[in-house]
Amino acid sequence: MGKFEDKKQLRCSFCGKNQEQVKRLIAGPGVYICDECIELCSEIIEDEFEGNTESSPLEASNLPKPQEIKDYLDQYVVGQDRAKKSLAVAVYNHYKRINANKAEDDVELQKSNILLLGPTGSGKTLLAQTLAKMLNVPFAIADATTLTEAGYVGEDVENILLKLIQNADYDVERAEKGIIYIDEIDKIARKSENPSITRDVSGEGVQQALLKILEGTTASVPPQGGRKHPHQEFIQINTSNILFICGGAFDGIDKIIEKRGTKSSIGFGAEVKGKSEKNVGELLKDIMPGDLLKFGLIPEFVGRLPVLVTLEALDNEALVSILTKPKNALVKQYKKLFELDNVKLDFTEEALKAIADEAINRKTGARGLRAIVEETMMDIMFDIPSEENIVKATITEETIKDRKDPELEKLPEGEVRPTLKTEKKNKARKDIETA
């Protein structure tokens, strides 16, 4: 009888204890769990959650210092030291402010959004992307040219926030500490320095619409994007701790700065001043908020972007460094592509300089480098998979400038290069034999 009762006794499916050995046994479909196992699971989940919270780079103890931020940017972005220092300090202060405002204090620190000014292809977007990657925070890129004032055809400014929420997997709390990069911000400048009489829905109107979210407000975001309508549900997001980085080329602002710097005088004794010998990069260093107003940004908008960071146009030396030095440099990427076919790829120093010169001539900066290399490599990348005796390709200056074929190193006729997989097997076999 006792044996029969023992068989019928209920046990925890995880630890094996019977119902008499535990306080409570909870039944599920064909499974049982005791209160002790539930408590243990709860502790494990809590420890993991605390571990993730502690490792957050935004906590005061883990927040990277400006020097550490700059060192990280140096790995991916060539040159622009002044811009990297300014960005590192601004980002450090922003997240330090978030941690400080959590505490009960009389002094509330205000947000300092950032305005990046620099020519096309100088690294504005890459700097913002790299910062977000380092800090492990949600990041979204928006194009200011697609935005219009509410009620007109185009995107509402709230759609920018939706991109950030989506990139945070709809975790609103995490999105509220993210970074938003608004590109082409110079394209929403009003058409003249004076206030417009007619409605400027894609210029001044967008600036007005952006004011609140830049400063910090609780915005209502449609979960599916598009226009708002009264009967839909909204996601509420507070933008007070979102860092906004706006970037633009601001073509022509150098003339405004130059004009401000050269005061002309009238009369026979007047000093005749020639055109400034400074280049665009040097002139941008002298930028003042008043220059942005003359360019067409409204005073309230300029006031919400207090940190002005200028980037210089990239010269030949900087572009060659961009091709070769960063962790994910373009030359390294193409060498890896060829390596997958077991072919060695080399670029001569003259070829790299020729690629950089072409990018400068096209006025595309670093952004145009990939297009130039892709044009050059198209034929050889087409031929290599079929011509199995090629083991090395060297890109020369003539390949870039005159579109001549690369210098190829081939195996004797009839021989075929081994595949990467075969070569690895042969190497492993040789290592075993010599061991």
UniProtKB/Swiss-Prot annotation:
SUPFAM superfamilies found in the cross-reference section: Glucocorticoid receptor-like (DNA-binding domain), P-loop containing nucleoside triphosphate hydrolases
Q: Which PROSITE patterns match?
A: CLPX_ZB (PS51902)
Q: Which GO terms describe its biological process?
A: cell division; proteolysis involved in protein catabolic process
Q: Which SMART domains match?
A: AAA, ClpB_D2-small, zf-C4_ClpX
Q: Region (Disordered) spans which residues?
A: 401-435
UniProt keyword Heme, yes or no: no
Q: What is this protein called in UniProt?
A: ATP-dependent Clp protease ATP-binding subunit ClpX
